From Swiss-Prot:
Keyword Iron carried by entry: no
Record pathway: Purine metabolism; 7-cyano-7-deazaguanine biosynthesis
Organism (species): Methanococcus maripaludis (strain DSM 14266 / JCM 13030 / NBRC 101832 / S2 / LL)
EC numbers, comma separated: 6.3.4.20
UniProt record similarity statement: Belongs to the QueC family.
Keyword field: ATP-binding, Ligase, Metal-binding, Nucleotide-binding, Zinc
GO molecular function, one term: ligase activity, forming carbon-nitrogen bonds
Residues holding Zn(2+): C195, C206, C209, C212
Protein name per Swiss-Prot or TrEMBL: 7-cyano-7-deazaguanine synthase
Free-text comment on the cofactor: Binds 1 zinc ion per subunit.
Upper lineage: Archaea, Methanobacteriati, Methanobacteriota, Methanomada group, Methanococci
């Protein structure tokens, strides 16, 4: 069985790729260049994880997105919330809007669907999850359901997108990741890269952007040793 894993190199997509591997899928991974500030680090991380999982890795250029995106992920204007802001819906929604890239997931998953159909893969694995679904509308079960409905008309082999993490929050994802590492006898989590920034050194996280803060909290609440190096602990 063939599958495509959309792999940014982050915690969610790394765990999702391990999950697909654990289900004996022959996986290929895709990383998208949409002009993000952390692009080089994401590619290095995704390539390393792909090598560990024995998966073909592909980088797909959708750099045109930055021509109309005002997202902090493209401009570098990254919000740095406080810990107590992470569960404040209004503040989290404001942060979400600051890093929202127009139609990014729709574009990426559509291209991944074409890739999957072209190589005869039956599934696309994505790292969409419960915690990010609170504020990001394209991380919700409703998005997955409606996207799959469009694939019934947009592909001949009825490719489907699956999101094995959609009922999990970040601590649960970190815990699952550790369990999968043990099951597969592989080290993956320490090579994942969640930071919105490029901090000039491989796998080095800033520790202050929202993505880093959620990552730190995930490992802490899961009771798992955090393998991540941060500029600000």
């Amino acid at each position: 069985m063939k599958a495509i894993c959309v792999l940014s190199g982050g915690l969610d997509s790394a765990v999702t790729s391990m999950f697909a591997k654990s289900k004996n899928y022959d996986i290929s991974t895709v990383t998208f260049n949409y002009g993000q500030m952390a692009l080089n680090q994401e590619i290095k991380s995704a390539k390393k994880i792909s090598d560990i999982l024995n998966a073909d890795h592909h980088v797909i250029d959708i750099n045109f997105v930055k021509e109309f995106s005002k997202s902090g992920l493209n401009t570098g204007n990254i919000p740095e919330p406080e810990n107590e802001d992470l569960d404040d819906f209004e503040k989290s929604e404001k942060t979400m809007k600051a890093v929202w890239v127009p139609a990014r997931n729709m574009i990426m998953f559509s291209i991944a669907s074409g890739f999957a159909e072209g190589i005869g893969a039956e599934k696309i694995f994505s790292g969409l999850n419960k915690e990010e679904g609170v504020t990001f509308p394209d991380n919700t079960p409703e998005f997955i359901e409606r996207f799959n409905k469009s694939l019934e008309y947009g592909t001949l082999n009825k490719v489907k997108m699956v999101a094995p993490l959609y009922e999990l929050n970040k601590p649960e994802i970190a815990k699952l990741g550790k369990e999968l590492e043990l099951k597969l006898d592989l080290e993956v989590l320490k090579y994942s890269y969640s930071c919105y920034k490029d901090n000039g050194k491989d796998y080095l996280h800033c520790g202050t952007c929202e993505s880093c803060m959620r990552r730190k909290r995930a490992f802490k609440e899961a009771g798992i040793t955090d393998p991540t190096k941060y500029l600000v602990e």
